[in-house]
Amino acid sequence: MAMDSTTLLDNFGRKLLDELQANARLSLAELGRRIGLSPTATGERLKQMEEVGILHGYTAEIDREALGLEVMAFIRMSCGGQNYHRLRDYVQTLEEVRECHHLTGGDDLLLKVTTTSLDDLEALIEALLPYGNPVTSLVLSSPVERRKFSVTGKLTTVTRKSPKRRR
């Protein structure tokens, strides 16, 4: 019997997602032991989560620097009009583009890119010029990288005190 996404995200489902985010290579027996289900029930739950789109595959994290991709940068693109669609299609063909996000505000797209050198980054920026105005920020370090989704605990939010109004 198929479950909907709400039912799949019960206590067992949330524990399962936490375990998979920590180590997606665990066996069904070990996953089941950790979340309190049999290996068969765990496997069925995984299959259903894949079918409804909660899970989208199991990937390895690869160290970009081990591949010689020493430079990481964000490029904000302002293009507008017809150039937006052309640029969106073009960046999908670029191996250097790791992520591309459509934005509100003054910029149209935000690209996360990696290259082997500053020379390669410069060549990439020049290739983007016909599509609009690229503004580049080099990444010096990443204090928070690939944060897991909080699925079993509450999300932590920062609260600010409201400023006192002058009368």
Write out the residue ranges for each language-model feature.
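A compositional/biophysical signature of low hydrophobicity enriched in polar/charged and small residues
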Residues: 1-167
